């Protein structure tokens, strides 16, 4: 009898827990995906903050030249970053227990891998949580579909690119200047500016920003009610009012006259679908471009210059881009030392500037 009561009690407890996390009446929806999201997001956030502030230098290139990235090791908020896992680790999974000591784990950049993997699981769970809440409320699943664009972009630079290049050391650094460093180095190594998917991605991001600004300004400019001819149109709207007075016909008429008739939408659904689809598709293509370049399927390379009938080079944008790429790549090349650092940085030894005379 006691065993039966305990089983029923535990079953009721689990049932109550399931009802609570899936309830849409809570101030914040948790959901089953939230059970995975919360611990992984907290782990990634806590380790990132600790590493950003106090992580010791990391031997990112695997050549015994540690690179400091934290605030306590000489960086400011702009230059500080979480340095990627060492090239000596490659693509191996490197949890704390795989290292001989905590110092070794930190020296080889273990926190970077820990942050990235937990962060990716967290954003996948967040996307699943968006779908779960939409399902519970009877909504269509377009919100998680739109969120899949930044998820794909993060996956491309933090996971797909290191896999394609053979090491987590090639992943994007987790910091402001580290992000710019990743972008600048990516250009000469893969000629990203000449990749069509990158071009589509740029059009998606900047076009999405333009369309968002246009839409917001049009909506704000048509928040009016019908006024008489002796009243100003501005009297038809009170800031913070509860009722909606947006008039899509007015916005459509204004924009149609500003450009041409068919440049505007007279249907709210098609308008908002376009506003969502344009940047999402663009970012999908950008993520796909990064993923293809991860395996060295790079942008167009015009290695042979255009020559005139006398064999002289006709300089083009491709030549300028090639020279810039070569310059960036040379600056980024890893130093090859002939001596260990403790010998190379020791006291200067006197050397003979002339050969000694040889007695005959």
From Swiss-Prot:
Residues 345-360 form a propeptide. GO terms for molecular function: chlorophyll binding; electron transporter, transferring electrons within the cyclic electron transport pathway of photosynthesis activity; iron ion binding; oxidoreductase activity, acting on diphenols and related substances as donors, oxygen as acceptor; oxygen evolving activity. Its EC number is 1.10.3.9. The record marks 344-345 as: Cleavage. NCBIfam families: psbA. Cyanobacteria usually contain more than 2 copies of the psbA gene. This is Photosystem II protein D1 1. It comes from Trichormus variabilis (strain ATCC 29413 / PCC 7937) (Anabaena variabilis). The lineage of its organism: Bacteria, Bacillati, Cyanobacteriota, Cyanophyceae, Nostocales. The gene is psbA1.
